[in-house]
């Protein structure tokens, strides 16, 4: 339940390009969220985490932010999993860090929680 396996990672250039071209987006600063629902028999959630090299030159800083975003998603994904399995939907999400400064875990976790709730509310309508 609290795992984040390779099968949950969004991979493949075509899938990523389609997500950014056709997906809906919003910002919960410092995270930009792009998501796209598809109706499928087997509901799955695929996640992409991104931190720009332009703003964070050092790989250590980028990797830390990606690790924090992955961890906060992993801990708070249960409501999203329940929603997708109930509605028989597949979901692709991209979390892109847009802040200029590095944030702590509490900040990122609260913003990811808000983002996941927004995704559920948007599709519930």
Spans of model-derived segments:
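Positively charged, solvent-exposed patches that mediate nucleic-acid binding
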Residues: 1-125
């Amino acid at each position: 339940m609290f795992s984040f396996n390779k099968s949950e990672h969004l991979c493949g250039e075509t899938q990523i390009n389609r997500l950014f071209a056709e997906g809906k987006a919003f910002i919960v600063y410092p995270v930009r969220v792009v998501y796209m629902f598809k109706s499928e028999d087997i509901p799955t959630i695929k996640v992409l985490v991104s931190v720009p090299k332009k703003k964070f030159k050092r790989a250590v800083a980028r990797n830390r932010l990606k690790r924090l975003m992955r961890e906060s998603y992993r801990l708070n994904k249960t409501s999203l999993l329940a929603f997708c399995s109930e509605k028989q939907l597949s979901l692709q999400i991209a979390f892109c860090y847009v802040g200029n400064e590095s944030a702590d875990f509490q900040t990122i976790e609260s913003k990811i929680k808000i983002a996941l709730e927004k995704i559920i509310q948007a599709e519930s309508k």
